[in-house]
Design a protein with these regions (language model features):
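Cytochrome P450 heme-thiolate "Cys pocket" and heme-binding signature region
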Residues: 59, 72-117, 124-132
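Short, glycine-/Ser/Thr-/acidic-enriched flexible segments
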Residues: 52-53, 89, 147
C-alpha cells in the first residue's frame, strides 16, 4: 500500500468483509412476510448473519481467501456486502458510523505503512470467531517501533 494508494480502499473493505466487527446483527420484523417457506411474523426478532453473508460462495469467489483486489472497480450494492448491516444509509437501517470506521481504518493503515517502522515477531495470529471481539491469540505484538525519518 505504500506505493499504491489505490489498494488502500480495497484492503480496508476486504478486512471488513472477512473480519466483520460483529458476526451478526439483530432486527425486528416490520411487517409479516414469507421467505423460502418460512414465515416471519411482524414484531419478531431475527438475526442477520454478517459473516455468513460476506463469505457466501454464491456472491464471493474464494470467499474465505483474503483478496483485496476483489474490491477494485466493484460496483457498490447495499445488500451483498454488509459488514456493518445492510441497506441504504439514508432510507434503511445501516450503521451510521460505517463511514467513520472506514476513514479510521484507512488512517491507521496509512500510519502503519508510511509513518513508522517496526518488527513483527513470530506469533499466533489465529482468530477465534466465537470470541467477541475476535482477537489474535497473542493480540498483535510489534517490536522496535520507531518513527520513520
Amino acid at each position: 500500500m505504500r506505493n499504491d494508494e489505490g489498494l488502500l480502499e480495497p484492503f480496508v473493505q476486504e478486512v471488513r468483509r472477512l473480519y466483520p466487527f460483529f458476526p451478526a446483527v439483530a432486527a425486528r420484523v416490520k411487517s409479516t412476510f414469507e421467505w423460502q417457506g418460512y414465515r416471519f411474523p411482524k414484531g419478531h426478532r431475527v438475526l442477520l448473519d454478517l459473516y455468513g453473508t460476506n463469505t457466501d460462495r454464491r456472491s464471493w469467489d474464494a470467499p474465505v481467501e483474503f483478496r483485496p483486489e476483489r474490491f477494485r472497480g466493484r460496483a457498490e450494492n447495499p445488500y451483498d456486502f454488509i459488514p456493518q448491516g445492510g441497506g441504504n444509509h439514508y432510507t434503511n437501517h445501516r450503521c451510521p458510523g460505517e463511514w467513520i470506521a472506514i476513514s479510521q481504518m484507512k488512517a491507521f493503515c496509512r500510519y502503519l505503512v508510511n509513518d513508522i517502522d517496526y518488527d513483527v515477531p513470530d506469533q499466533d495470529l489465529e482468530l477465534d470467531p466465537g470470541e467477541l471481539p475476535s482477537l489474535p491469540q497473542n493480540r498483535f505484538i510489534m517490536r522496535n517501533v520507531r518513527r520513520r525519518q
